[in-house]
Amino acid sequence: VDYIIIASLLAVLSWSFVDAVSKLYINRFGKELSSMILLAIGIIPMLLLATAYPYLGNILFLLFIGLVGGLVLFLGYILVYKSVPSGGVSNSYILLEVQPIILILFGIFVLGEHIGMEKAASIILIFIGISLILLSKKFKLDKRLVPALIGNVMWAVYWAIIILAFLYYKNFVLPLLFVRVFGAFFAYLYYKAKPPKNYYKINLSKLEISIIAILILAGLFDGFGNILFAFVSFSNKVVFGSAILSLDPIIIWLIGLIAYHEKITVRQKFGFLVATTGYLLFTLL
């Protein structure tokens, strides 16, 4: 279990870095170009890892999983990145709590993993916390955060699809690689579908180069995080790994407040505390 904990925590740290710096490159390059570069760069660590694993055949299966999973993965990035500039880092990424909840339920009802009543109660607390974050001052749904919510559901679906692919293929590296390649391809098509006049023209100033470097580093960390969580999932520890994964949005929520000075309502603060309490109960009980 120790290596599962280490792998899960390293995945959290990797994704926390990506999420924390995402506002910098999204504001600079836009969601289309940012998604394309991030997905493409993330292929590199997966490709390096794939060289150490044998090819098990069944190319049609890999292409099918790549097509379906890649589309869902791409849609997750575009939708979440649409919310970040207006909804803020804190509130957009606290909705990442949706992912582990869905994956925990997936692990229980589909993969046959088990949790106790205490953990089930903590999941309900996380749901309540997320609901409070999504509501505006007048108890209406904050429309700025709807894309982020849907995007995080998409990411959870992506993981559900690819975990089933791991179990069928008896290997997690090649399905992960194929999905990433197709995701980058869809991001490229989406970017090229824009009118040429709307393409971002990169100006190689010192600021521009630094943000490009951050984006490239984020892509590498994102790919690394995917490899780590894929390994955890392939080890039949989806529920356990997903519970630790819940720490990521809590870290990002605090970074958004401290580093970006984002403003949130009292209700959203309370929602954060409720969701965090649910996470702590899940991991400690």
Please annotate each region the language model reported.
Residues 80, 101-121, 137, 250-270:
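C-terminal transmembrane-helix exit sites in multi-pass transporters
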